Amino acid sequence: MYNFIRQITEGRLGKTLERVKLAYPLDGLGKSLSKQALEYHYGKLYKAYCDRYNAGEGDADFNEAGAYLHSIYFSQFRAPKGSNKPDGSVLTLIEEHFKSWEKFQEAFEKAAMAIQGSGWVYLAKDGEIKTIKNHQIKKDIVILVDWWEHSFCIDYQADKKAYLNNQWKIIDWSIINARLT
């Protein structure tokens, strides 16, 4: 299988892009992201970035970056279970830069809510919260939240804060910690 994230990170692009395989069923993220939202977001929009890139349609850089970001986004989730708090290296990074998980969440929400229009918000490997306008490949992503309307409108309409708060419930911290190694 074409490992898109690794090839971008290592700077080696293949001739075709494929979506990452989900580690959960389309109905496996509970109320955080519905089956309907995933069918549309993962099944149509993310797929379209790969398909357009592979067909040479549209802006190749835009489609490539869109596919890359969605690969990171969809690969960081797991089914919701219990209290979902960070641990390991990511918790250390968060506490070094924000003092606590709760203060990190507040800072992340503030950065996300400040985005005018669409984009992405992420925790970077240097401990900063950063935003991406449009689509751009960034190699320092630890936690990534899609802030385009298609990400939250199906399940949350315009309630971006509820969307963000429910993202924390499905983050797979083992994957996030692996991004820091």
Show where each model-derived region lies.
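Feature for soluble, non-membrane regions of globular proteins
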Residues: 2-181
